[in-house]
Design a protein with these regions (language model features):
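Short beta-strand/loop segment that forms part of the nucleotide-sugar
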Residues: 145-148
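A short alpha-helical cap/connector motif
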Residues: 1-124, 130-141, 151-196
Length: 196
């Protein structure tokens, strides 16, 4: 009988619990890094205390706090040329923009988590309305879209439909409270689900 350490078994269990891809593994190195180092990351950043203060001051929920943390991790981990918050009921995210802009590095080759290919200079969007989503998909990629759907199921359906129609191409991650889309011609359509 082969020996497996308890750490290896725990990692395998976490992998099976966190990432579901219709019974298949994550084959894209970019998607694997996105899932493990950004979406599922548990490390605390020094900016999280400031983010928590802003979210609580606006009386937002725990789901909004998790999305704000994820939005910050996305800004910190990828080369970002611009950040926009689009839609109503996102005043807390508007207040976080200066903090997010301090975290970005717009140079793919010099990025602390890189280097990234030159074509991976993303626009980062937080979208809360269908009209804003329709407007953004007309812009040229690459873009990272974080779309909170826990209060607006029709926005989730619209995002999935745009991905199936090919209007949004790239990686789509179904989160419990949001849709995360990495729209880039570099990636073929990939769909994942994170349960954490």
């Amino acid at each position: 009988m082969a020996f497996c350490s308890s750490l290896a078994l725990a990692a395998k269990s976490l992998w099976l619990r966190c990432f579901s891809h219709g019974g298949h593994g994550v084959h894209s190195p970019f998607a694997f890094e996105l899932l493990t180092r950004v979406v599922e990351e548990k490390s605390l950043y020094s900016a999280f205390a400031s983010i928590r203060d802003v979210v609580h001051r606006h009386g937002r929920s725990e789901q909004d706090l998790r999305l704000a943390f994820l939005f910050y991790r996305l800004a910190a981990h990828y080369p970002i040329k611009r950040i926009q918050v689009l839609g109503a009921d996102s005043d807390y995210m508007q207040e976080l923009l200066p903090l997010l802009e301090r975290a970005i590095c717009p140079y793919p080759s010099e990025h602390p988590y890189g280097p990234y290919p030159r074509e991976d200079l993303f626009s980062l969007f937080f979208i809360t309305e269908e009209a804003a989503l329709t407007q953004i998909i007309e812009e040229p990629p690459p873009a990272i879209l974080l779309i909170p759907t826990w209060q607006n199921p029709s926005l989730k359906r619209r995002t999935i439909r745009y991905c199936k129609e090919g209007r949004l191409s790239g990686i789509r991650i179904d989160l419990p409270t949001a849709q995360l889309v990495i729209s880039s011609p570099r990636f073929h359509l990939q769909q994942y689900k994170s349960t954490l």
